[in-house]
């Protein structure tokens, strides 16, 4: 079968994967004797990752959905990449791997502890590669996401990119709370450390129906940087990216505003389900590429993330 093959690295390659019969699988979650494992559930839809978290589905970073629902929701609530492409002939906003760009030439490559996606848009002269793998041997759990955009056109390209997650579940809410009291639990949700460029997502305090309220110090973190190690601007308020488009079908605010203007907007960090996007602007000549590195994971406290940030960017 020409659409199913193994590449030179021994990875199983599925071409045009989103149009195939749906399937679901997991990354191995091996973190080594001193690491902290992360469970990562993926499907052959959208940008593949359907949900992930620590320990079990009651500690999600991306909300857990069973396979039958993940096939439907992953293109919207999974990882998303929005590219604003400006050439001499005009400006367009393009989302690789989306269900409405089915004409793109796409493939999924499945390795032992990695998953890579590729989309080539002949119409826009763009190639997008996304590589996922879990981080072993660290005092925190982490999913690495590497996004590379290549200008396949024969003219220079001015690129603005937003990449990340439309919904990040702060630490402290279980699966039942998300499913049965999702709106109520938003009252406890908060994002800390935004001013330092590494959002830290957790509940402000325990939300259990008990007489005692306990402190929550652990949380989920998200950081991203470019090829030089420079940290990227984070967006945690979905209204800044999507506006009032609660269906998450398109980044309405990013479509109409420059990235620099979005960076200046005030972001609400409490009382709503946050997102996790990072933005960058580049000028790519013909054949040139740019890469963004992201790390999403769980840590015992915010001080641990601050200590490790500089090392991780190297």
Show the residue positions of the predicted features.
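Anionic coordination/interaction segments
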Residues: 1-314
